[in-house]
């Protein structure tokens, strides 16, 4: 069998989908769509210096949409848009303990982009899993600030 439940295999506790990250080239225009047309509540905008990204967050109460715009030239988001265009950049899963998640993933030889948590938008501790390990999707794990 190729698939085992996480209880039998990794014991990684995923609390749910935290957000979907979308790379955009026009934050104001795209924000208008999510906020004014779809009427999703805008909760937060900030620049995350460590990632050179400006984030604008819309909360559906069952998951968030995080719009990502480069805040500096040569940022990861700018490169992504240049190479792949705008669109879904990553899926973020909330975990209860980011440090334990990193240990469990490394035990299973999962390739991480950063193996030490960084502070991301809204103060979450974050780590990214390389698309090589996920079937082509950039996955972010995030622990809510206490």
Predicted regions mapped to residue ranges:
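Acidic-residue sensor for enzyme active/binding pockets
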Residues: 18, 66, 140-143
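Long, hydrophobic N-terminal alpha-helical segment
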Residues: 9-51, 75
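Intrinsic, low-complexity N-terminal interaction/targeting segments
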Residues: 42, 48, 55, 66-79, ...
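Conserved Rossmann-like nucleotide-cofactor binding loop
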Residues: 63
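Vicinal oxygen chelate
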Residues: 8-13, 17-25, 56-59, 78-146
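Short, small-residue-biased leader/transition segments that mark boundaries at the very start
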Residues: 1-2
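Hydrophobic side chains in well-ordered alpha-helices
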Residues: 30-33, 101-105
